Amino acid sequence: MSKNYHIAVLPGDGIGPEVMTQALKVLDAVRNRFAMRITTSHYDVGGAAIDNHGQPLPPATVEGCEQADAVLFGSVGGPKWEHLPPDQQPERGALLPLRKHFKLFSNLRPAKLYQGLEAFCPLRADIAANGFDILCVRELTGGIYFGQPKGREGSGQYEKAFDTEVYHRFEIERIARIAFESARKRRHKVTSIDKANVLQSSILWREIVNEIATEYPDVELAHMYIDNATMQLIKDPSQFDVLLCSNLFGDILSDECAMITGSMGMLPSASLNEQGFGLYEPAGGSAPDIAGKNIANPIAQILSLALLLRYSLDADDAACAIERAINRALEEGIRTGDLARGAAAVSTDEMGDIIARYVAEGV
């Protein structure tokens, strides 16, 4: 693999810098094992950028991201900056503008129950025993969150509020292709979530998804209403491979998927644009209460690196190597404190060292 790649690294706040350090250890192992030419540059973002530059997303950070093939993002936010106006706080002032600037229209959230962690799953033991490995593909830029008109008007008993669910054909086509392409790298099944028995936007959604499905004859397509999907995720999550969702439905289902895994410290996330450029981050927050204690679980950050390799650098072999290394560590009972349940726990640094070593060894 001879191409040169460049990654913008944005560690951020709280546990972000310490878990990012572990992801970069793993990246070193990937570089060496797969002879990949990958360089990195670090930039301030979030609260760290406010402290150092007076704003959560400095121009130099945006420029650095523009020059990169992908962004590896840590986490932002914390009580130190909560007194600031909302649009100047780390989350709203950094992450949302980055998504908008790079036109990141799709969000990918894997949710997997790892062998040995079934006890953390809040579902019944017989359901958890079947395991699950789901990818929730959510459209990020359309739908009811952004549709117009929206607002409030009137007064007294006639006061009202309104939002508008709007989807264009091109928005549905491109998110559907992301889901089908992802399914080709997984178990070849897409379940599209809608409310086509009631909503016009969902009727269009279903029609277009059916059209796109003809381009992917090797991928099985099923449709499911959102209300049934929320129940089926509790009843038997193992039936799902890729979930294809609108903005609102994906917002709901991706969090439900996260909850049934039992540990936010294990969940990565990817946001992509049409050119394959992506921002990759853990699904959890900055956890300022445990920052600097060397006890945070770095696996979500390391898995975010795996997604980056798979989707932005087209290095699926390297991504799989990371995932296998994590599987082995967990199967051997290696746990950070959030997963230890009274047993011996390893530190953040130790978990990073172990996973990097397993990647290097090619387990």
Swiss-Prot record:
<keyword id="KW-0560">Oxidoreductase</keyword>
<protein>
    <recommendedName>
        <fullName>3-isopropylmalate dehydrogenase</fullName>
        <ecNumber>1.1.1.85</ecNumber>
    </recommendedName>
</protein>
<keyword id="KW-0464">Manganese</keyword>
<keyword id="KW-0520">NAD</keyword>
<dbReference type="GO" id="GO:0046872">
    <property type="term" value="F:metal ion binding"/>
</dbReference>
<comment type="subunit">
    <text>Homodimer.</text>
</comment>
<dbReference type="GO" id="GO:0030145">
    <property type="term" value="F:manganese ion binding"/>
</dbReference>
<feature type="binding site">
    <location>
        <position position="109"/>
    </location>
    <ligand>
        <name>substrate</name>
    </ligand>
</feature>
<comment type="function">
    <text>Catalyzes the oxidation of 3-carboxy-2-hydroxy-4-methylpentanoate (3-isopropylmalate) to 3-carboxy-4-methyl-2-oxopentanoate. The product decarboxylates to 4-methyl-2 oxopentanoate.</text>
</comment>
<keyword id="KW-0432">Leucine biosynthesis</keyword>
<dbReference type="InterPro" id="IPR024084">
    <property type="entry name" value="IsoPropMal-DH-like_dom"/>
</dbReference>
<feature type="binding site">
    <location>
        <position position="99"/>
    </location>
    <ligand>
        <name>substrate</name>
    </ligand>
</feature>
<dbReference type="GO" id="GO:0051287">
    <property type="term" value="F:NAD binding"/>
</dbReference>
<keyword id="KW-0028">Amino-acid biosynthesis</keyword>
<keyword id="KW-0100">Branched-chain amino acid biosynthesis</keyword>
<dbReference type="InterPro" id="IPR004429">
    <property type="entry name" value="Isopropylmalate_DH"/>
</dbReference>
<keyword id="KW-0963">Cytoplasm</keyword>
<dbReference type="Pfam" id="PF00180">
    <property type="entry name" value="Iso_dh"/>
</dbReference>
<dbReference type="GO" id="GO:0009098">
    <property type="term" value="P:L-leucine biosynthetic process"/>
</dbReference>
<feature type="binding site">
    <location>
        <begin position="78"/>
        <end position="91"/>
    </location>
    <ligand>
        <name>NAD(+)</name>
    </ligand>
</feature>
<feature type="binding site">
    <location>
        <position position="138"/>
    </location>
    <ligand>
        <name>substrate</name>
    </ligand>
</feature>
<keyword id="KW-0460">Magnesium</keyword>
<feature type="binding site">
    <location>
        <position position="251"/>
    </location>
    <ligand>
        <name>Mg(2+)</name>
    </ligand>
</feature>
<dbReference type="InterPro" id="IPR019818">
    <property type="entry name" value="IsoCit/isopropylmalate_DH_CS"/>
</dbReference>
<dbReference type="GO" id="GO:0003862">
    <property type="term" value="F:3-isopropylmalate dehydrogenase activity"/>
</dbReference>
<feature type="binding site">
    <location>
        <position position="227"/>
    </location>
    <ligand>
        <name>Mg(2+)</name>
    </ligand>
</feature>
<comment type="pathway">
    <text>Amino-acid biosynthesis; L-leucine biosynthesis; L-leucine from 3-methyl-2-oxobutanoate: step 3/4.</text>
</comment>
<feature type="binding site">
    <location>
        <position position="227"/>
    </location>
    <ligand>
        <name>substrate</name>
    </ligand>
</feature>
<feature type="site" description="Important for catalysis">
    <location>
        <position position="195"/>
    </location>
</feature>
<dbReference type="GO" id="GO:0000287">
    <property type="term" value="F:magnesium ion binding"/>
</dbReference>
<keyword id="KW-0479">Metal-binding</keyword>
<feature type="site" description="Important for catalysis">
    <location>
        <position position="145"/>
    </location>
</feature>
<dbReference type="GO" id="GO:0034198">
    <property type="term" value="P:cellular response to amino acid starvation"/>
</dbReference>
<dbReference type="GO" id="GO:0005829">
    <property type="term" value="C:cytosol"/>
</dbReference>
<feature type="binding site">
    <location>
        <position position="255"/>
    </location>
    <ligand>
        <name>Mg(2+)</name>
    </ligand>
</feature>
<comment type="similarity">
    <text>Belongs to the isocitrate and isopropylmalate dehydrogenases family. LeuB type 1 subfamily.</text>
</comment>
<feature type="binding site">
    <location>
        <begin position="285"/>
        <end position="297"/>
    </location>
    <ligand>
        <name>NAD(+)</name>
    </ligand>
</feature>
